[in-house]
């Protein structure tokens, strides 16, 4: 376990197992103010934000990148177990769900690109986010990225 605050990724991430846009394995961790706009690919436990998450606390996150894998693949978290979550949002992308497997605690809300590229969405996802139409293809960024 550990903690991380105000983390972002815009690059392509690929590997085999425990692959996330930000964290491969976040067991017993506290993570907040997170976003990923990069594509993520792996085999098992693959997620847009976290590949494998167990008994953690996570909040204020969004993901827009594509996610691809063979087993336990989710737009937000590949495998989620007994995690306290709040303010998780993902870009709607066909049939892929926010969680590959969700065993308690996981809730994430789908949004369209036009809904996400607004000041209202930046405020909704969390206080560390700001909207600047000239950055990040119009998706919100973390406040430290514009200082």
Model-derived features: positions:
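Predominantly extracellular beta-rich ligand-binding scaffolds that present long acidic/polar faces
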Residues: 1-147
């Amino acid at each position: 376990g550990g903690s991380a605050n105000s983390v972002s990724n815009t690059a392509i991430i690929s590997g085999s197992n425990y692959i996330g846009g930000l964290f491969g394995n976040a067991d017993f961790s506290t993570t907040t103010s997170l976003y990923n706009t990069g594509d993520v690919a792996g085999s098992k436990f693959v997620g847009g934000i976290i590949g494998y998450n167990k008994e953690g606390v996570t909040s204020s996150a969004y993901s827009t990148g594509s996610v691809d894998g063979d087993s336990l693949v989710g737009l937000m978290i590949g495998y989620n177990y007994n995690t306290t979550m709040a303010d998780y949002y993902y870009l709607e992308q066909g049939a892929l769900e926010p969680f590959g497997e969700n065993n308690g605690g996981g809730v994430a809300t789908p949004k369209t690109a036009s809904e996400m590229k607004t000041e209202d969405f930046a405020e909704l996802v969390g206080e560390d986010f700001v909207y600047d139409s000239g950055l990040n293809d119009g998706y919100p960024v973390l406040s430290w990225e514009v200082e």
